């Protein structure tokens, strides 16, 4: 899944497709490709060109092809089923190569469909779920000789989500489009018809677009677009006019990238988890790079990271030790390589880096490998140095993150590290299959819980920000998982608002930090329901008694906290081990809101860079 683009009209298609794919590069991807309709009559066929790596590589290859094709489809892929490779890249084709498709989404019953199709003589070339669609359409086309009808028929067999565009060499100039739970936009410009998964790919051609709804289909031709429902009945589309410029389109209509990326976090959770658990309840991490026997031998774990990634590591420590019972240490990468840590062949070093190119983290990886450790990477960038130099890797599927302050990548890291902790616990037989399946389901539910926070807590966040905006300093506190999130909350506030903030485990208050508190001093606490809730409340009462303005991230329905809090930001009730995923979102929103009130640039804070590539 990642980006879809299609064009049919009078202009040269390859140029339009490449431009559209480039517009969507910010979404992240590992490969790209196009299918172009070439020739006429009996000589008509499809040229399919695919590349691993950047769209620039695809563009270079296309520049060497003298093609006047005026109809085609393109795609950027981020692997979900099957590793990044040319054979797994889109577009995928039917057995005879006369139908090509691009697809975003997940086909949940693809294994069953593939087995049935192979039993009927179809030959699969890739490991992807998407290829199932090409063969289903091929079968239907043999009966209907109508591409749109064949796409509609194929969709009746599929369980899952799809944004789909298909072309057929026997129907020149036609693109058939379908949508269910995966975005698709359609537009008509002066020289033809367009389809994409993101309006940004169409912004140069047209400002009037139709956002397909679930169960709707579109047939694109150079003359225009026909819209139908699942039964093939014509429907009247709802046309939306966009006044966005390119900058606004890239931001998805949000005022800044930071807010856009905060709002993308439900999708990040879903994308990072998709396809990760088999129906039998076993975790499936194709990119593992380590055998189950090697994992079972692991007796010590180091999580090495910097900045926000370090805080994700603190959460991982609790999970790995709690579930797998493996001693785990979290280290700043800049310190790890200089202190001669104890490393043996049964040590696992987990390197966490959003960019995959953090200099200190890379140096620590190399040092650990020399000493014989197994190395596992958590990163957001396919093919990055961290990915290349690790034995295995989990990609966070956050897509490109533009704001300097990491938000969605952090959530992706926490979810990925949670998967690793679950896997280690299963390998060590510390969790049963039933327990792992239950925890995985609850982890998946955090996507909806984040969405609830985004939908309901805007006013509370603004009220909390008003209590902080004129402060000189702020204190974040929490216990257990709440402490780990407090460290991240303090960093976010410092990064984007330039307000000095520190975080402490709440139990350390009386050992120094309480000396900071005077009337009006903001104290931000993570006090969700947990085994240490009462003790955290007691610490907050001490702050309140000294005049602090107490802002609390608290569980929905908790009335007790009302007695001491000046402002409450609510989060849904979750198992304590998953509270970092939900409780971090209000702190991200708070940091951004304080920064906005203080007139700061939230996307590009002063003195900071997105990735630190020097030591």
Regions found by a protein language model. Give the residues of each.
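Hydrophobic alpha-helical scaffolding
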Residues: 7-10, 103, 123, 140-144, ...
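Generic C-terminus detector
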Residues: 232, 549, 562-564, 570, ...
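Conserved short alpha-helical segments that host acidic/polar catalytic motifs at enzyme active sites
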Residues: 1-251, 255, 267-299, 338, ...
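Glycine-rich phosphate-binding loops that contact phosphosugars or nucleotide phosphates
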Residues: 296-438, 442-445, 526-571, 590
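Active-site phosphate/pyrophosphate-binding segments
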Residues: 156, 265-269, 273-302, 392-522, ...
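Glycine-rich oxoanion-binding loops at beta->alpha junctions
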Residues: 70, 74-87, 279-293, 316-352, ...
């Amino acid at each position: 899944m990642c980006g879809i683009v299609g064009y049919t009209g009078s202009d040269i298609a390859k140029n339009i497709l490449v431009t559209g794919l480039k517009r969507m590069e910010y979404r992240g991807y590992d490969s790209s490709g196009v299918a172009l309709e070439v020739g006429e009559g009996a000589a008509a066929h499809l040229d399919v060109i695919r590349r691993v790596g950047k769209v620039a590589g695809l563009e270079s290859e296309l520049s060497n092809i003298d093609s006047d094709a005026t109809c085609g489809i393109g795609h950027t892929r981020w692997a979900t089923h099957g590793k990044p490779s040319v054979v797994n890249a889109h577009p995928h084709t039917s057995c005879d190569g006369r139908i090509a498709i691009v697809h975003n989404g997940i086909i949940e019953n693809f294994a069953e469909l593939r087995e049935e199709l192979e039993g009927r003589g179809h030959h699969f070339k890739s490991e992807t779920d998407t290829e199932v669609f090409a063969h289903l359409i091929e079968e239907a086309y043999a009966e209907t000789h109508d591409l749109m009808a064949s796409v509609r028929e194929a969709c009746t067999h599929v369980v899952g989500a799809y944004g789909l565009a298909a072309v057929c060499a026997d129907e020149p100039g036609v693109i058939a489009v379908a949508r269910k739970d995966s975005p698709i936009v359609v537009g008509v410009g002066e020289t033809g018809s367009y389809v994409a998964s993101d309006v940004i790919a169409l912004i140069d051609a047209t400002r009037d677009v139709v956002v397909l709804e679930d169960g709707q289909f579109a047939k694109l031709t150079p003359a225009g677009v026909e819209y139908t429902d699942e039964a093939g009945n014509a429907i009247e589309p709802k046309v939306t006019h966009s006044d966005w410029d390119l900058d606004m389109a890239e931001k998805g209509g949000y005022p800044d990238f930071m807010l856009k990326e905060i709002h993308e976090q439900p999708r990040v959770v879903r994308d990072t988890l998709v396809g990760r658990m088999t129906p039998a309840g076993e975790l499936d991490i194709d990119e593992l790079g380590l055998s189950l026997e090697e994992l079972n031998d692991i007796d010590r774990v180091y999580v090495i990271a910097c900045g926000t990634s370090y805080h994700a590591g603190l959460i991982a420590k609790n999970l790995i030790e709690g579930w797998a019972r493996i001693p785990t240490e979290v280290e700043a990468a800049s310190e790890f390589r200089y202190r001669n840590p104890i490393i043996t062949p049964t040590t696992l070093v987990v390197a966490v880096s959003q960019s995959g190119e953090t200099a200190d983290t890379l140096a620590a990886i190399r040092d650990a490998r020399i000493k014989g450790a197994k190395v596992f990477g958590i990163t957001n960038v396919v093919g990055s140095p961290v990915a290349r130099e690790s034995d295995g890797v989990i990609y966070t599927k956050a897509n490109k993150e533009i704001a300097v302050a990491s938000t969605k990548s952090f959530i992706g890291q926490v979810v990925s590290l949670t998967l690793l902790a679950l896997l280690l616990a299963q390998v060590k037989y510390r969790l049963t299959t039933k327990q792992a399946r239950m925890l995985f389901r609850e982890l998946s539910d955090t996507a909806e819980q984040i969405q609830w926070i985004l939908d309901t807590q805007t006013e509370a966040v603004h009220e909390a920000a008003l209590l902080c905006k004129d402060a000189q300093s702020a204190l974040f506190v929490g216990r257990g998982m709440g402490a780990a999130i407090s460290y991240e909350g303090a960093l976010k506030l410092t990064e984007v608002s330039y307000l000095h903030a520190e975080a402490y485990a709440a139990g350390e208050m009386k050992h120094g930090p309480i000396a900071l508190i005077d009337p009006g001093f903001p104290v931000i606490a993570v006090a969700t329901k947990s085994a240490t809730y009462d003790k955290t409340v007691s610490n907050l009462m001490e702050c309140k008694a000294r005049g602090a303005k107490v802002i609390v991230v608290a569980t929905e329905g908790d009335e007790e906290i009302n007695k001491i809090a000046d402002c409450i930001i609510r989060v849904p009730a979750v198992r304590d081990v998953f509270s970092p995923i939900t409780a971090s979102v209000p702190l991200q929103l708070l940091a951004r809101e304080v920064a906005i009130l203080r007139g700061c640039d939230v996307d590009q804070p002063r003195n900071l860079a997105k990735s630190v590539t020097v030591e």
